Protein backbone atom coordinates (compact mmCIF):
# COMPACT_ATOMS: atom_id res chain seq x y z
CA UNK A 1 0.00 0.00 0.00
CA UNK A 2 1.60 3.23 -1.08
CA UNK A 3 0.70 5.66 1.66
CA UNK A 4 0.08 8.80 -0.42
CA UNK A 5 -1.95 7.19 -3.18
CA UNK A 6 -4.35 5.21 -1.01
CA UNK A 7 -4.94 8.02 1.48
CA UNK A 8 -5.68 10.34 -1.45
CA UNK A 9 -8.07 7.75 -2.88
CA UNK A 10 -9.85 7.38 0.48
CA UNK A 11 -10.09 11.17 0.78
CA UNK A 12 -11.50 11.38 -2.77
CA UNK A 13 -14.15 8.77 -1.95
CA UNK A 14 -15.08 10.54 1.29
CA UNK A 15 -15.33 13.85 -0.58
CA UNK A 16 -17.62 12.08 -3.04
CA UNK A 17 -19.93 11.10 -0.16
CA UNK A 18 -20.02 14.74 0.98
CA UNK A 19 -20.81 15.90 -2.57
CA UNK A 20 -23.66 13.38 -2.84
CA UNK A 21 -25.01 14.54 0.54
CA UNK A 22 -24.86 18.20 -0.54
CA UNK A 23 -26.77 17.29 -3.69
CA UNK A 24 -29.40 15.38 -1.68
CA UNK A 25 -30.04 18.18 0.81
CA UNK A 26 -30.07 20.83 -1.92
CA UNK A 27 -33.21 19.16 -3.28
CA UNK A 28 -35.00 19.59 0.07
CA UNK A 29 -37.44 22.45 0.00
CA UNK A 30 -36.96 25.42 2.27
CA UNK A 31 -38.99 28.62 2.39
CA UNK A 32 -37.37 29.86 -0.82
CA UNK A 33 -37.93 28.60 -4.34
CA UNK A 34 -35.06 26.67 -5.90
CA UNK A 35 -34.88 24.71 -9.15
CA UNK A 36 -33.19 21.91 -7.14
CA UNK A 37 -36.54 21.16 -5.51
CA UNK A 38 -37.57 19.36 -8.69
CA UNK A 39 -34.36 17.25 -8.97
CA UNK A 40 -36.03 14.04 -7.69
CA UNK A 41 -38.89 14.34 -10.22
CA UNK A 42 -38.84 11.84 -13.07
CA UNK A 43 -41.13 11.90 -16.09
CA UNK A 44 -42.50 9.07 -18.22
CA UNK A 45 -41.17 10.26 -21.59
CA UNK A 46 -40.43 8.55 -24.89
CA UNK A 47 -40.93 5.08 -23.43
CA UNK A 48 -38.73 5.46 -20.35
CA UNK A 49 -38.39 7.45 -17.12
CA UNK A 50 -36.27 10.58 -17.42
CA UNK A 51 -35.24 13.34 -15.01
CA UNK A 52 -37.40 16.44 -15.41
CA UNK A 53 -34.39 18.58 -16.35
CA UNK A 54 -33.94 16.46 -19.52
CA UNK A 55 -37.35 17.39 -20.92
CA UNK A 56 -37.80 20.94 -19.60
CA UNK A 57 -36.08 24.09 -18.39
CA UNK A 58 -36.69 25.07 -14.74
CA UNK A 59 -36.47 28.71 -13.61
CA UNK A 60 -37.33 30.73 -10.51
CA UNK A 61 -39.20 33.87 -11.69
CA UNK A 62 -40.38 34.83 -8.17
CA UNK A 63 -39.31 33.88 -4.63
CA UNK A 64 -42.31 31.56 -4.16
CA UNK A 65 -42.81 30.38 -7.75
CA UNK A 66 -41.13 27.91 -10.10
CA UNK A 67 -41.59 27.94 -13.85
CA UNK A 68 -41.12 24.82 -15.95
CA UNK A 69 -40.80 25.34 -19.72
CA UNK A 70 -41.41 22.01 -21.45
CA UNK A 71 -39.46 21.67 -24.70
CA UNK A 72 -41.89 19.25 -26.37
CA UNK A 73 -45.51 20.41 -26.21
CA UNK A 74 -46.74 16.79 -26.20
CA UNK A 75 -44.92 16.23 -22.88
CA UNK A 76 -46.74 18.93 -20.86
CA UNK A 77 -49.28 16.46 -19.43
CA UNK A 78 -46.60 13.93 -18.49
CA UNK A 79 -44.52 16.64 -16.79
CA UNK A 80 -47.54 17.84 -14.81
CA UNK A 81 -48.35 14.25 -13.78
CA UNK A 82 -44.74 13.60 -12.74
CA UNK A 83 -44.64 16.72 -10.55
CA UNK A 84 -48.00 15.90 -8.91
CA UNK A 85 -46.97 12.28 -8.24
CA UNK A 86 -43.56 13.22 -6.81
CA UNK A 87 -44.87 13.61 -3.22
CA UNK A 88 -43.40 17.10 -3.02
CA UNK A 89 -46.80 18.62 -2.25
CA UNK A 90 -46.72 20.78 -5.39
CA UNK A 91 -49.66 21.61 -7.67
CA UNK A 92 -48.51 22.80 -11.10
CA UNK A 93 -50.73 25.09 -13.18
CA UNK A 94 -50.55 24.51 -16.94
CA UNK A 95 -50.05 27.71 -18.93
CA UNK A 96 -49.59 26.70 -22.58
CA UNK A 97 -46.22 24.99 -22.91
CA UNK A 98 -45.20 26.18 -19.43
CA UNK A 99 -46.12 25.08 -15.96
CA UNK A 100 -46.24 27.54 -13.09
CA UNK A 101 -45.70 25.98 -9.70
CA UNK A 102 -46.61 28.14 -6.70
CA UNK A 103 -44.77 27.03 -3.56
CA UNK A 104 -47.12 26.91 -0.59
CA UNK A 105 -45.94 28.03 2.84
CA UNK A 106 -44.31 25.19 4.73
CA UNK A 107 -46.27 24.29 7.84
CA UNK A 108 -44.59 23.05 11.02
CA UNK A 109 -45.39 19.40 10.30
CA UNK A 110 -43.93 19.58 6.78
CA UNK A 111 -40.80 21.33 8.09
CA UNK A 112 -40.27 18.58 10.66
CA UNK A 113 -40.69 15.87 8.02
CA UNK A 114 -38.12 17.63 5.80
CA UNK A 115 -35.69 17.74 8.74
CA UNK A 116 -36.26 14.00 9.22
CA UNK A 117 -35.46 13.40 5.53
CA UNK A 118 -32.30 15.52 5.89
CA UNK A 119 -31.25 13.31 8.84
CA UNK A 120 -31.82 10.20 6.70
CA UNK A 121 -29.62 11.66 3.94
CA UNK A 122 -26.93 12.47 6.54
CA UNK A 123 -27.03 8.93 7.92
CA UNK A 124 -26.73 7.50 4.40
CA UNK A 125 -23.64 9.70 3.81
CA UNK A 126 -22.09 8.68 7.14
CA UNK A 127 -22.59 5.00 6.30
CA UNK A 128 -20.85 5.56 2.94
CA UNK A 129 -17.95 7.28 4.74
CA UNK A 130 -17.68 4.41 7.24
CA UNK A 131 -17.54 1.95 4.34
CA UNK A 132 -14.64 3.91 2.86
CA UNK A 133 -12.94 3.86 6.29
CA UNK A 134 -13.46 0.09 6.56
CA UNK A 135 -11.98 -0.44 3.09
CA UNK A 136 -8.96 1.66 4.06
CA UNK A 137 -8.45 -0.19 7.34
CA UNK A 138 -8.79 -3.57 5.60
CA UNK A 139 -6.18 -2.48 3.06
CA UNK A 140 -3.82 -1.45 5.86
CA UNK A 141 -4.27 -4.77 7.69
CA UNK A 142 -3.60 -6.68 4.48
CA UNK A 143 -0.49 -4.60 3.71
CA UNK A 144 0.75 -5.13 7.27
CA UNK A 145 0.07 -8.88 7.08
CA UNK A 146 1.83 -9.14 3.69
CA UNK A 147 4.83 -7.31 5.12
CA UNK A 148 4.47 -4.30 2.80
CA UNK A 149 4.39 -1.95 5.79
CA UNK A 150 5.56 -2.26 9.37
CA UNK A 151 3.36 -2.35 12.46
CA UNK A 152 4.25 1.21 13.48
CA UNK A 153 3.56 2.57 9.99
CA UNK A 154 0.28 0.62 9.89
CA UNK A 155 -0.79 2.12 13.22
CA UNK A 156 0.19 5.62 12.07
CA UNK A 157 -1.72 5.26 8.79
CA UNK A 158 -4.80 3.82 10.52
CA UNK A 159 -4.81 6.82 12.88
CA UNK A 160 -4.69 9.14 9.85
CA UNK A 161 -7.59 7.25 8.21
CA UNK A 162 -9.60 7.53 11.45
CA UNK A 163 -8.83 11.26 11.71
CA UNK A 164 -9.91 11.76 8.09
CA UNK A 165 -13.14 9.84 8.82
CA UNK A 166 -13.88 11.91 11.93
CA UNK A 167 -13.31 15.19 10.06
CA UNK A 168 -15.52 14.12 7.17
CA UNK A 169 -18.35 13.02 9.48
CA UNK A 170 -18.12 16.33 11.37
CA UNK A 171 -18.42 18.12 7.99
CA UNK A 172 -21.63 16.15 7.34
CA UNK A 173 -22.96 17.09 10.80
CA UNK A 174 -22.17 20.78 10.20
CA UNK A 175 -23.93 20.76 6.81
CA UNK A 176 -26.93 19.01 8.42
CA UNK A 177 -27.22 21.61 11.19
CA UNK A 178 -27.07 24.43 8.62
CA UNK A 179 -29.79 22.78 6.50
CA UNK A 180 -31.95 22.18 9.59
CA UNK A 181 -31.77 25.88 10.47
CA UNK A 182 -32.63 26.81 6.89
CA UNK A 183 -35.66 24.48 6.84
CA UNK A 184 -36.99 25.53 10.25
CA UNK A 185 -36.58 29.26 9.53
CA UNK A 186 -40.03 30.80 9.13
Curated annotation (Swiss-Prot):
Molecular functions per Gene Ontology: ribosomal large subunit binding
Cross-referenced InterPro entries: Ribosome_recyc_fac, Ribosome_recyc_fac_dom, RRF_sf
Keyword Protein biosynthesis among UniProt keywords: yes
Region described as Disordered: spans on this chain: 140-163
SUPFAM superfamilies on file: Ribosome recycling factor, RRF (SSF55194)
Location of the protein in the cell: Cytoplasm
Pfam families according to UniProt: RRF (PF01765)
GO-annotated biological processes: cytoplasmic translational termination
UniProt keyword Cytoplasm present: yes
GO cellular component, one term: cytosol
Keywords recorded for this protein, A-Z: Cytoplasm, Protein biosynthesis
Described purpose of this protein according to its UniProt entry: Responsible for the release of ribosomes from messenger RNA at the termination of protein biosynthesis. May increase the efficiency of translation by recycling ribosomes from one round of translation to another.
Recorded family membership: Belongs to the RRF family.
Name listed for the protein in its UniProt record: Ribosome-recycling factor
The species this protein was found in: Rhizobium rhizogenes (strain K84 / ATCC BAA-868) (Agrobacterium radiobacter)
Gene name of the record: frr
Amino acid sequence: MSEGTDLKELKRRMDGAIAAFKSDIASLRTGRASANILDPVTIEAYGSRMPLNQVANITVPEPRMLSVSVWDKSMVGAVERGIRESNLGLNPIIDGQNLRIPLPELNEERRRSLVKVAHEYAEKAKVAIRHVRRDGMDGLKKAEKDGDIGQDEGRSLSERVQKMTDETISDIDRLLVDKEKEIMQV
